[in-house]
Amino acid sequence: MLRDTLKKAEKAREKKALYGEDIDLEKFIKEEAGEHEEVTRAKEVPKEVQETLLRVGVDPEERERAGTFIQVDQSGICTTCASESIEIMGMNVALDKYSWLKDYMWKAVAVDTDKYTATTALREAEGEMGGYFIRSKPGAREVFPLQACMFIGDERVMQTAHNIVIAEENSELHIITGCATGEDVSSALHVGVSEFYLKKGARITFTMVHNWAEQVEVRPRTGIMVGDDATYINNYILTSPVKSIQSYPTAYCTGENSRVVFQSILGGQKDSVLDMGSRVILEGRGSSAEMVSRAVSKDSSQIYSRGHLAGRVPEVKGHLECHGLVLSDDSMIYAVPELEGSATELEMSHEAAVGKIAEEEVMYLTSRGLTEEEAASMIVRGFLSMDITGLPPELAAETKRMLDMSLKGM
């Protein structure tokens, strides 16, 4: 099996991605694992790193957190776990501990998807395994979230990570992931492969905040397998400048009455190119999906907002919604909603709208004493501050705090 995987990866080494600008991987440094010193607690990382972690929802003090994983460049430097109902560890550790884990690798994401997945697999074969393993035990319902951070601290580094998350039957798991760069980093590449497996009756909420440097390129590759009566909720926030990001996670609702929700908040600034979307394949009877995105473009940014709902069996439901605000003549939002139905008795719909700030709203706020700039900023923040559904009250409040912090620059 490993040999077949590596053969596929080798053949796809130069394979361009379907979407997004092609990246020359040779211009980045392939740093070895173990280059950074390990710490026993998150609060032991340098002060300037702690401040960056807070901006992406990762608390160095680990207050109300069930566990923590931090990867700097290619090195897993911190792993803690405060709960007996879940497991969190580096993938290199998990593969040594569990021989069965390799059976989950490259099942939700094909290794030959493109050059980025292929490069991740080839680096793994060379011993440069990055990423985390998270598992909730059967019946476990952890109240506090786990937190994970992918941090790039060195210039021109290529960071690869292969994450696997397993929610066993009737378990519930909440994860906050923050991705960021150090203050001295201007350019780098992050490639994150993430595979989620939700067993019968399981539930995962996954909230991700990105805060990259202006010349960082980002290529996440994500697949989600959703079993009977399972629910996966994904919240994504990006409002800081980045050179380019291209992400198109795909969820497979193979289980009966399975459910998937994708909610994205995108703020394009400066020369950023954001090619974002999500795809849900509804293959189990009674399965459903909801995909909602809010996008704002300013300066000379470009946003491609994609969504694809595919109903393959009867009695499935799906809704796709994309709303965008264009704030400058040099910026652009390109909405691409797709509905695909290949069975009877299904319900799928989409709603897309791209426009500008309403002048009457600005006039109303300026009449109340705000400047035009303050009024526009308030309207934008209100537009992007959509309600994040599906979270426990404590985590919903934490997510709102993370969102408010992200929107300060908009």
Swiss-Prot record:
Superkingdom of origin: Archaea
Coiled coil, from the record: none
GO biological process, one term: iron-sulfur cluster assembly
Annotated family: Belongs to the iron-sulfur cluster assembly SufBD family.
Protein name: Iron-sulfur cluster assembly SufBD family protein MTH_1150
Organism the protein comes from: Methanothermobacter thermautotrophicus (strain ATCC 29096 / DSM 1053 / JCM 10044 / NBRC 100330 / Delta H) (Methanobacterium thermoautotrophicum)
